[in-house]
Structures are given as C-alpha cells and as structure tokens.
Amino acid sequence: MTTQTTNIRDDIRKADDVFEKNFSQGNAAGIAELYTNDGMLLPTGSDFVKGKEAIRDFWQGAINMGIKEAKLDIVEVEVQGNVVVEVGHYQLKGAGGDVLDQGKYIVIWKQEGGQWKLHRDIWNTSRTA
C-alpha cells in the first residue's frame, strides 16, 4: 500500500467514524452532509435515492424504524483516478444492541470542497430471506 493510499484510507476511516457518530445520535442531516451534492444511494428494494435532501430523508426513515447504530468495517480502499472505492462490511443495530442487519457495501468517494465525500453508496444484506 502506498503512502497516498494509506493516507486516503485514514481519511475514509475518519469519514466513516463521523457517519457512525451521526447515526448513533439520530442525526440524518449530519449523515446527508457527508455525501456529495449529487450523491446517490442504491438501496435494496428501492429506486435510486438522489441528492442530499432525499438522502437525509432516507436515513431519517431508517432511524425512525429503530436503527440506532451503524458499524462500518473497511475491507479495502482502492484509489482509481480522482475517485476512491471502499469495500466493506456493515452492521446495523437497534435498541439494546440487537443486530437488525449485516451485509456488505461499496462506496465510491469523490472529493468535494477539499473533503472526501460519499458519491455513490450501495449495500446489500448478507442475511437470508
């Protein structure tokens, strides 16, 4: 791993930490601010969720459904030109620490305003139906 990749991985980990903190505080607006202005979610069973307002509303809905904590574990970070691809595992917990879902994700990160921000965010569960 190059020094540049190591530094970018650290930047992505810090951004993931902020995502997790905002989630645990029920701060959907704070989560949405971590995305680019034209950011997009690609959730299972749903159409594209485009833009910060829609992203905020999506995460607020998840919080309202009882998800209290999101844990993100990076598996790999790969620099590809002017974007970064993060692959990892996630775990969503409810009140009392009950695991509500777990799975894997890919995020394409893009710099905006000098900061790495989530640009495309896709995930799917590892749980069987």
Task: Walk through the language-model features, giving the residues of each.
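A beta-strand edge to alpha-helix "cap/lid" segment located at domain peripheries
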Residues: 2-33, 40-129
